[in-house]
Curated annotation (Swiss-Prot):
May play a role in muscle cell metabolism. The lineage of its organism: Eukaryota, Metazoa, Ecdysozoa, Arthropoda, Hexapoda. Pfam families: Cyt-b5. It comes from Drosophila virilis. It comes from the Eukaryota. This is Cytochrome b5-related protein. The keyword Ribonucleoprotein does not apply. Heme binds at H59, H82. The keyword Metal-binding applies.
Length: 142
């Protein structure tokens, strides 16, 4: 990608650090992301900086992902992987401070498309018959 054309994506307010370095690797991408989001070596979700250090070993999804994302903005991943509102309430105790404005232009307003869709999915899941899953789980255990 050429720096002059990066704004066409409209996702970020600045060109990603190390993105023009060849080759772009997972490690260079993560390094650039850590530098760009200014999470100060902690985790950023929306407009907050969080210290999940004490939570790493308790994370229900395992320790790998949460360790690897330290120092980055995990907003979109946090939203996509947590359908219930419980995790959002739980992270409040880990908040260190408010953060500067995000470099990403994606929004997750409470009355916006994504949050509305997420709420509708949450409601729909309450009505889904879970018997086929239970039957499948039992047969897997045999």
């Amino acid at each position: 990608m050429v720096i002059e054309t990066w704004k066409k994506s409209g996702i970020a307010t600045k060109f990603p650090t190390y993105r023009n370095s060849a080759p772009v690797t997972v490690h260079s991408w993560q390094k650039g992301k850590r530098q760009d989001v200014e999470a100060e070596g902690l985790w950023r979700i929306k407009d907050g900086i969080y210290d999940f250090t004490e939570f790493i070993d308790k994370h229900p999804g395992g320790t790998f992902w949460i360790r690897e994302t330290k120092g980055t903005d995990i907003t979109e991943a946090f939203e996509a992987h947590h359908l219930t509102t419980a995790p959002e309430k739980m992270i409040a105790k880990y908040k260190v401070r408010d953060a500067y404005q995000r470099i990403y232009t994606l929004t997750l307003h409470e009355d916006g498309f994504y949050k509305t869709l997420k709420e509708r999915v949450r409601e729909k899941l309450k009505t889904i018959d879970k018997r086929p899953k239970r039957k499948s789980d039992v047969s897997d255990d045999l």
